[in-house]
Amino acid sequence: MTLSTPPSSTRPSRRKFLQQSAVGTATVYGLSLERSAHAAGSAAIKIGMLGCGGRCSGAANYALSLGKDVKLAGMMDVFQDRMLEKRDFFRKEFPDQFIASDETCTSGLEGYKAVIEASDAVLIACASKYHVFYAEEAVKAGKHVFIEKPHAIDPAGCHRLRRLCELAKKKNVC
């Protein structure tokens, strides 16, 4: 039996495949987050953004579009102008779901604490070197975590994340 490759015109491009895979992953993530939050007895799912660039904003936009029970509780970015721009965007586009206060809309490197505290789930899409640190802080606080790729930038970070996954399982936030 000979397997042939379909002509390139019928094969999806690598870009198209990755886009469709990302949408599928986000959908599964959204469903599992919704189920776990509702199973815990909470009516609303509060999300927080660590990073206000295109990827984190896109993930937050998608999560908020899942339904009125998803609320944006906080956002942080190193650059204040970027955070303010996204804050204004989400306030306008999702007025009933934007519940972030001035204390949970922060800039700089220390603002992550207020965002994690205010959230049930944290979207991490910022400079890759901070992914592991922010994920550790969120899981230790008992929060669900979504991290953009790359999850870690070196082998030590990968090992820390692997151990963090075990902690997340114990805390039932995986």
What residue ranges belong to the model's regions?
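Rossmann-like NAD(P)-binding element
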Residues: 114-133, 146, 153
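A structured beta-alpha segment of the ubiquitous adenosine-cofactor-binding alpha/beta core
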Residues: 94-124
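Loop/turn elements at helix/coil->beta-strand transitions in domains of secreted/extracellular proteins
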Residues: 43-45, 68-71, 119-122, 141-144, ...
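Beta-strand-loop-alpha-helix segment that lines the small-molecule cofactor/substrate pocket
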Residues: 132-174
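Extracytoplasmic/secreted proteins, especially bacterial periplasmic and envelope-associated proteins
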Residues: 58, 81-85, 114, 130-134, ...
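N-terminal Rossmann-like dinucleotide-binding module
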Residues: 24-95
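N-terminal secretory signal peptides and thylakoid transit peptides that target proteins
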Residues: 4-25
